[in-house]
Amino acid sequence: GVVLYGNRVSFTGASNLICRHLRIRMGTNGPDGKDAAGIANGENMIFDHLSVTWGRDENFSINWDSKGKLPRNITIQNSILGQGLQNHSCGGLIQTDTESGITLFRNLYTDNKTRNPKVKGLNQFVNNVVYNWGSGAAYNMGGDSSGQSETTIEDNYFIVGPVDNWQNVRQEDNSIKVEKVPMSPTPPF
């Protein structure tokens, strides 16, 4: 497949697009505070088998444009979104209204501190794996963003990794709850 290094990739304004087997690697040479890939408006897009890493803000974000035009009917599937760089290290910010759907299906969010993803609006988050999400949220609906959300969250796996300060705690009914725990400093040796 094709690999794009060093700068942000934008799909803004596209319609009726299918993008497959693309690797996007922004890295530290990319613009500070920018996403590795994103959409600010557009419709009817499918992203399949992408690998998007090393973003300096988020790895892949979907938002309104500056004129308030919404992205509509977007699917990201069978993709890897991970290893956000620097202190921000986020998987993605996905924001629409409650009529413009975004589907995230069978993706791997890995090694991002938070926003794996952070969503607002109409969202389906189905059969994804979130691994090693650090000190932030594994999945965040709404958060401090204003606006309504209608979200379907089904059959996802949240796997604690080596930098997480979360642990699985078995409940009385044998269900598993993931709880945040204070981290102690790691000994140097």
What is each PLM-predicted segment?
Residues 1-2, 15-26, 41-57, 67-115, ...:
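Right-handed parallel beta-helix
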Residues 6-13, 62, 119, 142:
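Short, T/G/N/S-enriched strand-turn elements that build extracellular solenoid repeat scaffolds
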Residues 30-32:
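Short, solvent-exposed loop/turn segments at conserved positions within beta-propeller repeat blades
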Residues 143-144, 149:
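Accessory, usually C-terminal, subdomains that scaffold auxiliary metal cofactors
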Residues 164-168:
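N-terminus-biased targeting/localization segments
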Residues 179-189:
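C-terminal functional modules
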